[in-house]
Amino acid sequence: MAAVPSAVHLPRCVVSPTGRHSASLIFLHGSGHSGQGQREWIKHVLNQDLTFQHIKIIYPTAPSRPYTPLKGGLSNVWFDRFKISMDCPEHLESIDSMCQVLSGLIDEEVKTGIQKSRILIGGFSMGGCMAMHLAYRSHPDVAGVFVLSGFLNKASVVYQDLQQGGRMLPELFQCHGSADNLVLHAWGKETNSKLKSLGVSTTFHSLPNLNHELNKTELEKLKSWILTRLPGETDGQSE
């Protein structure tokens, strides 16, 4: 595992809760994007910010690094990959080092008084893949994981770790467009099926005719799921 300076600080965009903060959500963007860009994209789709009365949303930005699919060009990516395909090895050195960095972000929330069981991790595309590595390998005690248009490689170390058993398995919420021509729908479905076979409680929503993008239906389904995993302090709390 590559060493990561303890001083690494990820730029982030934060949407504060409208009421008392009692839970946190970390939303990881896709390759080449940014935390601010992810927030603005969601705001454009919903015609408003994704907000909650009690949940703080954190949109961090990945560091700029050489990215092999861009022939070594610099891009804001959570990790490197040899190509965008299920059928290749994972670039574990970069994945593991970023797990360390993002663990620091989780620790920051815990230090403010938020229990790990009140933290959700997820993301779009590469961000969803990163979230699965982070949660299932390093932080299995989080409230859940969400993946939008993402996948794991066929021989992912995530599967290898889960095969060992004896650990908590956060619930997985997954959405994928049926017309996705970058990250194929079949890749997302296969990832979901494999994790389910390893004991993960999963849901998978196919979005008809949706390419590699977000839509309102998807985000509304996500918001409903978030509230089942991170409910407010009272049953009658309005969102």
UniProtKB/Swiss-Prot annotation:
Q: Which SUPFAM superfamilies match?
A: alpha/beta-Hydrolases (SSF53474)
Could you confirm whether the keyword rRNA processing appears in this record? no
Q: What is its EC number?
A: 3.1.2.22
Residues annotated as catalytic = S125, D180, H212
Q: Which reaction does it catalyse?
A: S-hexadecanoyl-L-cysteinyl-[protein] + H2O = L-cysteinyl-[protein] + hexadecanoate + H(+)
Subcellular location(s) per record: Cytoplasm, Cytosol
Give a GO cellular-component term.
cytosol
Q: Classify the source by domain of life.
A: Eukaryota
Q: What is this protein called?
A: Lysophospholipase-like protein 1
Q: Which UniProt keywords apply?
A: Acetylation, Cytoplasm, Hydrolase
Q: Please name the PANTHER family in this protein's record.
A: LYSOPHOSPHOLIPASE-LIKE PROTEIN 1, LYSOPHOSPHOLIPASE-RELATED
**MF annotations from Gene Ontology:** palmitoyl-(protein) hydrolase activity
Role summary: Palmitoyl thioesterase that catalyzes depalmitoylation of CGAS and KCNMA1. Acts as a regulator of innate immunity by mediating depalmitoylation of CGAS, thereby preventing CGAS homodimerization and cyclic GMP-AMP synthase activity. Does not exhibit phospholipase nor triacylglycerol lipase activity, able to hydrolyze only short chain substrates due to its shallow active site.
Query: N-acetylalanine is carried by which residues?
Result: A2
Report whether Cytoplasm shows up as a keyword of the record: yes
- Any matching Pfam family: Abhydrolase_2
Which InterPro entries does UniProt cross-reference here? AB_hydrolase_fold, LYPA1-2/EST-like, PLipase/COase/thioEstase
The first-level EC class reads hydrolase
The record lists the organism as Mus musculus
**Family membership noted in the UniProt record:** Belongs to the AB hydrolase superfamily. AB hydrolase 2 family.
Instruction: Return one Gene Ontology term, BP aspect.
Output: negative regulation of cGAS/STING signaling pathway
